[in-house]
Amino acid sequence: MKKGIHPENYRTVLFYDSNAKQGFLIRSCARTTTTMKWEDGHEYPVFMCDTSSASHPYYTGKTRQIANEGRASDFVNRYGKFGTLKSK
């Protein structure tokens, strides 16, 4: 690396995905306040991530179904039986 072009706090940081329970060692300037012991026995500053390539559906191939149906079908499911006529 060329000297003098990187910030002073450019160091190895552990980016830890809390959903996948997996970490990545990356050189970064991210500000951190906590440290974590890594698999190699060294202690690194840790940056907690909610999503990374280990847990994102695009990279894992797993799909999440948030809403299968629209608002109209929710209405029909809730109130559809009130419009039917009952025979005596």
UniProtKB/Swiss-Prot annotation:
Pfam families linked to this entry: Ribosomal_L31
NCBIfam families: L31, PRK01678.1
Originating organism: Pasteurella multocida (strain Pm70)
InterPro entries: Ribosomal_bL28/bL31-like_sf, Ribosomal_bL31, Ribosomal_bL31_B, Ribosomal_bL31_sf
Domain of life: Bacteria
Assembly, per entry: Part of the 50S ribosomal subunit.
Native organism taxonomy: Bacteria, Pseudomonadati, Pseudomonadota, Gammaproteobacteria, Pasteurellales
Family: Belongs to the bacterial ribosomal protein bL31 family. Type B subfamily.
Xref: PROSITE patterns: RIBOSOMAL_L31
Protein name: Large ribosomal subunit protein bL31B
GO MF terms, alphabetically ordered: structural constituent of ribosome
One Gene Ontology CC term in the entry: ribosome
Keyword Ribonucleoprotein: yes
Entry keyword Ribonucleoprotein: yes
GO biological process, one term: translation
Keywords: Ribonucleoprotein, Ribosomal protein
